Amino acid sequence: MSSATQSARFSPSPISVEHLGTIGYVDAWDRQRELAAERAENLGADTLLLLEHPAVYTAGRRTEPEDRPTDGTPVIDVDRGGKITWHGPGQLVGYPIVKLAEPVDVVRYVRRLEQALISVCTDLGIDCGRVDGRSGVWLPASLDNGQWLPERKVAAIGVRVQRGVALHGFSLNCNSVLTGFDAIIPCGIRDAGVTSLSRELGRDVTVEEVTPAVTAAVVAALDGALPVTDHDIERVTFDSATAEKTAAAPTFTTVQYG
């Protein structure tokens, strides 16, 4: 059996799913740590927390001072990987609190989460995938009404593994008001944008609509029923693009989302 079809979890027992509705970030973080402490002692069950947060900025361990809001907006510093991001209404947040199979492979675990979200977005009709060196789910640069849009992230991933147990997880922009990202450098990436399912599909896509599919895909990916496949997006390099592309390419920092 290949690693792509093996379970990423230590336990063969089913994953428990908790729907927490809208919950403050610190309260959800406390719940994560409570569950993680149990799993580290081989107690309780692997659990997928699904929720929305009120608007909040959270900063991972690699956040630089220049990535933070310039207007003094409060930021919660957290112990996950990655940099700063925004959470808020219209964004599905998932925290799989999972004891990982040994030997622990954090990169493989992140690829499982990406695969689940790529599968959901693809089934909705969105062309998306991975970008080498950048976690999450991305859309390729594309031409929209004569204007080139940069690569843009529809789902972010940031995790921490402690005592063999994964915490934190992913966020999928459904019908979020994306202006929350304007005050920061999302994930510390300056040459790309942020988007949502609703923006890309041209219709309202709610958290409630996608939650069942995301739940099923995450469980399947972690259990090896949804194999990890190569799914990199096509990169547009404007230096080597056609004359037509080069002429139409805007300065990426001027492209606004939200």
UniProtKB/Swiss-Prot annotation:
- The positions annotated for binding substrate are 80-87, 156-158, 169-171
Q: What positions does the domain BPL/LPL catalytic occupy?
A: 42-226
**Keywords from the named record:** Acyltransferase, Cytoplasm, Transferase
Domain of life assignment: Bacteria
This entry's Enzyme Commission designation comes to 2.3.1.181
Q: Transmembrane helix: present as a keyword of the record?
A: no
A biological process (GO) of this protein is: protein modification process
Q: In which pathway does it act?
A: Protein modification; protein lipoylation via endogenous pathway; protein N(6)-(lipoyl)lysine from octanoyl-[acyl-carrier-protein]: step 1/2
Location of the active site: 187
- GO molecular-function annotation terms? lipoyl(octanoyl) transferase activity
Which Pfam families does the UniProt entry name for this protein?
LplA-B_cat
**Which NCBIfam families has this protein been placed in?**
lipB, PRK14345.1
The text of the family note is:
Belongs to the LipB family.
Q: What does this protein do?
A: Catalyzes the transfer of endogenously produced octanoic acid from octanoyl-acyl-carrier-protein onto the lipoyl domains of lipoate-dependent enzymes. Lipoyl-ACP can also act as a substrate although octanoyl-ACP is likely to be the physiological substrate.
Q: What PANTHER family does UniProt report for this protein, alphabetically?
A: LIPOYLTRANSFERASE 2, MITOCHONDRIAL-RELATED, OCTANOYLTRANSFERASE
Write down what this protein is called.
Octanoyltransferase
Organism of provenance: Rhodococcus opacus (strain B4)
| Phylogenetic classification of the source organism | Bacteria, Bacillati, Actinomycetota, Actinomycetes, Mycobacteriales
> Its gene?
lipB
